[in-house]
A protein has these predicted regions:
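A cross-family glycoside hydrolase active-site/sugar-binding cleft signature
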Residues: 15
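Active-site-adjacent betaalpha module
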Residues: 7-8, 19, 25, 30-169
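A short, N-terminal amphipathic alpha-helix
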Residues: 1-11
Length: 169
């Protein structure tokens, strides 16, 4: 899917959630919730400190590394639009349609999708290019997109999208 998007000339934007090394941009409520879940933000782990910018575990996985010119949005929260320049990047290029993929479906993907819709973007979420640790929440988040005639855009799988990209080429 990534190779096809690049080959078709689409702008690929990468996002990743993380905080400053001193955690000065980490709200108390988020810190407390993360501690309750057993995964405190900033805690040391096998990939470095959890959700801390600059740590190995904060980086994109090797298979999804950006190419030259592909923006990387470092977001302090769940939504890729909040406290970032994502909207400016998209608007300055005349982009009005987003193909959304990522993790976690019910949190970051959903937050970004809803914010994009509120900002007037047309959105397509790729069901099998999104993931969650909880299959039931993944399914529920995808189901919510299509309610009321597609209130949050549309959903398709990667095979359908790849087919549409081939036809458009």
């Amino acid at each position: 899917l990534l190779a096809a998007a690049r080959a078709s000339g689409m702008l690929v934007v990468h996002t990743r959630e993380g905080h400053r090394p001193d955690l000065s941009d980490l709200p108390d409520w988020k810190r407390i919730r993360a501690e309750r879940s057993g995964a405190p933000i900033g805690a040391a782990g096998p990939l470095g400190r959890l959700l801390v910018r600059g740590e190995y575990g904060h980086d994109l996985i090797d298979e999804l590394q950006p190419q030259v010119g592909e923006p990387v949005i470092d977001k302090p929260g769940y939504c890729a639009f909040a406290a970032t320049d994502l909207e400016l990047i998209l608007r300055s290029r005349g982009i009005d349609t987003l193909i959304i993929t990522g993790v976690t479906t019910e949190v970051c993907v959903s937050s970004t999708l809803r914010s994009a819709i509120d900002r007037g973007f047309n959105c397509l979420t790729v069901s099998d290019a999104c993931a969650s640790a909880h299959p039931e929440l993944h399914a529920a988040a995808l189901a919510m997109i299509g309610v009321e005639g597609g209130i949050f855009g549309e959903v398709c799988d990667s095979a359908a999208l790849l087919s549409a990209l081939r036809e458009a080429a």
